[in-house]
Amino acid sequence: MAAVPPLRDRLSFLHRLPILLKGTSDDSIPCPGYLFEEIAKISHESLGSSQCLLEYLLNRLDSSSGHVKLKVLKILLYLCGHGSSSFLLILRRNSALIQEATAFSGPPDPLHGNSLYQKVRAAAQDLGSTLFSDAVPQPPSQPPQIPPPAGMGAQARPLSALQGFGYTKESSRTGSAGETFLSTIQRAAEVVANAVRPGPDNPCTKGPLPYGDSYQPAVTPSASHTHPNPGNLLPGAILGARAVRHQPGQAGGGWDELDSSPSSQNSSCTSNLSRASDSGSRSGSDSHSGTSREPGDLAERAEATPPNDCQQELNLVRTVTQGPRVFLSREETQHFIKECGLLNCEAVLELLLRQLVGTSECEQMRALCAIASFGSADLLPQEHVLLLCRQQLQELGAGSPGPVTNKATKILRHFEASCGQQLPTLRLCAQPNSAAAPVGPADLLTSPVPAPGSQVFLQPLSSATVVPRSPVLFPSPNTLPPSALEEPSEVRTQLVCSSEQGTESEQRLENTDTPEDSSSPLPWSPNSLFAGMELVACPRLPCHSSQDLQTDLQKVTTEAPVSEPSAFAFLNM
């Protein structure tokens, strides 16, 4: 160094020392980009600051660490283009350490090898070629000026102008600050006047001009979504918005909703009643009274689904019934149920029933699949769906055999079974005069409610085995061969074929099995779960008759009981 920097510059340089220590730290972390600019500002402060900066960087370049050498070389390369001219002049005079760095080497690293030494040598060569190149442009002797602040207020330079609303910078126009200020105010006033003054190009004033000085509220474009009556419109009238009525003392300032139905006006007049009945009359959303809904809700409903309009339901039914396949896929069924939850389910069901008449077989099958999807969803009660679909499904089921007939029958049986309204099937082997036969009591499993006049509690009729009757008559065990008593299948065959002998055998069974005090024997239910178990006959003694059995019973009851000696001595006394 030719000259020693003054003490003032050295003290000023000490405040910037933490920046340099962070930029030339001995680690593999690269130097942050913002530190390059801060170090370049140090070189532009003064000549003494440039000397102190170069002295510090050369001392760090003389370090044995490769990471420090690489960081210092990159900083010096950046200062060649952004540093002061005095710093570059001093650096050219002290380039011995840069030449030594071009031959930097050392023991290879176990992980990276010689890559660090190669980077240091390459950076030193780039710095030397850049520092002593003749094509290097001379950097400015002063630091770059800070850009003027942007925003409201005056700029920090002479002949400045205001910035902000209504200001447009004109480079060709010159003048004093007062003239610029006045022109700015004039242009701002013109902008405000053009925004307020109604003109032919203003889209907000294309409606009819106001008559007189009376106040007319502004009309928003959202009023065009209303549904006016075509009969009340003039031929040349445009679909505009009706005038908004103001009612003081109401919520929201007393202004009516623009796109609400006429019922919203009634609800605004009777807002107290609507608040009282709103919680209890949410179910009546289709009514037009307006006392149970708020104006916003009625406006949304009137805009979404106008009254007597099922266009969305009709589009959904058309989408479902018109498809390439006969059956609905799982995705189509899920989409149909999701859309039905947002629409009127009863209207969708009625439209599906209409599709079953006069359409192709494919459309009928898809409509039936859509109707069947109501059985697996909670959109409508099963009883209500059965009530609406029963007649149509019965007519389809009674038609010519085919896939449509089978599908309609299955759906009808499914709804009847889910509602518990399936009628019991009659047996094919019943006699024509079986209507006159005594009807058996309701079975405990098939009919949970007992029939009127029947006994509620089950009581044994006699000690003997009771063989119940059924509408199908069967002979007594005495008329059957012994082999038939062992095989129940043969007994059933014999029972079906021996209908002529049924009356006599029934009388025999009543005389032998039924006690005398039982006036009305209880037959077996035809729909019982235990039907057929009476075919397994109980073995009886053929030599005994009913009179012998009664005599034996009387003897048993009349004989005195024989007391046996007890194991306890005090009981035998």
Swiss-Prot record:
Low complexity compositional bias, start-end: 260-293
Amino acid composition bias (Basic and acidic residues), ranges on this chain: 294-303
Entry annotated with the keyword Membrane: yes
Region spans: Disordered: 136-155, 194-311, 497-526
Listed Pro residues bias regions: 137-150
Predominant cellular place of this UniProt entry's protein: Golgi
UniProt entry keywords in alphabetical sequence: Cytoplasm, Cytoplasmic vesicle, Golgi apparatus, Membrane, Phosphoprotein
Topology versus the membrane: Peripheral membrane protein
Ranges of Polar residues composition bias in the record: 217-229
Localization annotation: Golgi apparatus, trans-Golgi network membrane; Cytoplasmic vesicle; Cytoplasm, Cytosol
CDD domains documented for this protein: ENTH_like_Tepsin
Name used for this protein in its record: AP-4 complex accessory subunit Tepsin
